[in-house]
């Protein structure tokens, strides 16, 4: 029965994909909301489509796993996998799991998702003893084999960097937490009572690599602050393998192709409905569930809390929507 439901979903969602029809953002909103009922589209107030393009990476970084990448295999009885799972409630004392960050106008999503999921995993593996935020900027600026910084990077290489060089601590620009907080300010949006200045016309450049703590109020040396991984790997493409990995070790990093309509996601279970391809994006999968019979992944984005469902989104599960199930990576921390 489960496979019949998935087959039906594939057929339905395939019928929805009619790219390049609407010519304006307003037309995309109307088209999405009139053609399907799984999710609601709404033009965001605080982020433009041009800003979103700067926050994405080239689609080459979303490619499925290559043969040289180790793929972890879980021996699991699929009948034992729960119908719903949410890392936020499974590990409520891990401060990173509930944290939504802001990558600003830089295609640093690959570094953010790695730092976020690694932060979660250190807390989980240590039973809360290592409860911190790891620095997206450390891997963004200092991993020379990861890719091109603000132009994008390979998620698996960020996890390999965690094994080889480690991540120091560091939170958001606003919080100035840890050794190396993010140095690129939010821009063009109002968050709470703070309105940030307009974004740079061409987006941000990749910050320079600095092998020291940039937070002057942090009293731990850069090398002593490093947190290391023991392994880095890809996760099998089957839904049950991704679920088993999250249950065993915590949230994973995944990459997918972004289309114009995703920019307008407001609520519901996203399925690509229309619009041009914009680029690739990396995110953190926290769990899964169903909404009126539609299976979904629960995902944390890095576009601040004003976007989507308070910074989160749900995307249809079991159909490899936009490639999201074929580019999942993770690793085990040293604790």
Swiss-Prot record:
Transferase is among the record's keywords: no
GO molecular-function terms, A-Z: cysteine-type endopeptidase activity
This enzyme's EC code(s): 3.4.22.-
Disulfide-bonded cysteines: 94-123, 106-150, 142-209, 143-146, 179-213, 187-199
Principal place of residence: secreted
GO BP annotations, alphabetical order: cellular response to gamma radiation; cellular response to UV; proteolysis involved in protein catabolic process
Domain of life assignment: Eukaryota
Enzyme class, spelled out: hydrolase
Active-site residue numbers: 109, 281, 301
Known glycosylation sites: 193
Subcellular location: Secreted
Induction details: Induced by ultraviolet and ionizing radiation through a cep-1-dependent mechanism.
Impact reported for residue 301 to A: No effect on protease or RIBE activity
A cellular component term, taken from the record's GO annotations: lysosome
Phenotype when the gene is knocked out: RNAi-mediated knockdown results in greatly reduced radiation-induced bystander effect (RIBE) activity in the culture medium of irradiated animals.
Miscellaneous field: Mediates the radiation-induced bystander effect (RIBE), a process in which factors released by irradiated cells or tissues exert effects on unexposed cells or tissues. Following localized ultraviolet irradiation of the head, mediates RIBE in multiple unexposed regions including the posterior region. Also leads to RIBE including inhibition of cell death and increased embryonic lethality of progeny in unirradiated animals exposed to the culture medium of irradiated animals. Likely to exert RIBE by acting through the insulin-like receptor daf-2.
PANTHER family: CYSTEINE PROTEASE FAMILY C1-RELATED
Similarity field: Belongs to the peptidase C1 family.
Summary of the function given for this chain in its UniProt record: Thiol protease which shows activity against the fluorogenic substrate z-Arg-Arg-AMC.
Protein name in the entry: Cathepsin B-like cysteine proteinase 4
Originating organism: Caenorhabditis elegans
GN (gene name): cpr-4
């Amino acid at each position: 029965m489960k496979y019949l439901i998935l087959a039906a979903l594939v057929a339905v969602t395939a019928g929805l994909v009619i790219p390049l029809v609407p010519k304006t953002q307003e037309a995309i909103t109307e088209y999405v909301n009139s053609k399907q009922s799984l999710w609601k589209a709404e033009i965001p107030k605080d982020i433009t489509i041009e800003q979103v393009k700067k926050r994405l990476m080239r689609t080459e970084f979303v490619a499925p796993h290559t043969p040289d990448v180790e793929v972890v295999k879980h021996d699991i009885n699929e009948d034992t996998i729960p119908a719903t799972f949410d890392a936020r409630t499974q590990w409520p004392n891990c401060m990173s799991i509930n944290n939504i960050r802001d990558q600003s106008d830089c295609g640093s999503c690959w570094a953010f998702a790695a730092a976020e999921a690694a932060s979660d995993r250190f807390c989980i593996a240590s039973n809360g003893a290592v409860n911190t935020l790891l620095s997206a900027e450390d891997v963004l600026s200092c991993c020379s084999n990861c890719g091109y910084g603000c132009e994008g990077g390979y998620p698996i290489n960020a996890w390999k960097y965690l094994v080889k060089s480690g991540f120091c601590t560091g939170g958001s620009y606003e919080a100035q937490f840890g050794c190396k907080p993010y140095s690129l300010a939010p821009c063009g949006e109002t968050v709470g009572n703070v309105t940030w200045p307009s974004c740079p016309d061409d987006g941000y450049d990749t910050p320079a690599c600095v092998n020291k703590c940039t937070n002057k109020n942090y009293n731990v040396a850069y090398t002593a602050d490093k947190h290391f991984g023991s392994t880095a790997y890809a996760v099998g493409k089957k839904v049950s393998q991704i679920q088993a990995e999250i249950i065993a070790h915590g949230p994973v990093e995944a990459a997918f192709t972004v289309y114009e309509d995703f920019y307008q996601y407001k609520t519901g279970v996203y399925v690509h409905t229309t619009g041009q391809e914009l680029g690739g994006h990396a995110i953190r999968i926290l769990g899964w569930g169903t909404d009126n019979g539609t299976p979904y992944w629960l995902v944390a984005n890095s576009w601040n809390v004003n976007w989507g469902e308070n910074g989160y989104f749900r995307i249809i599960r079991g159909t490899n929507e936009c490639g999201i199930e074929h580019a999942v990576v993770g690793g085990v921390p040293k604790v």
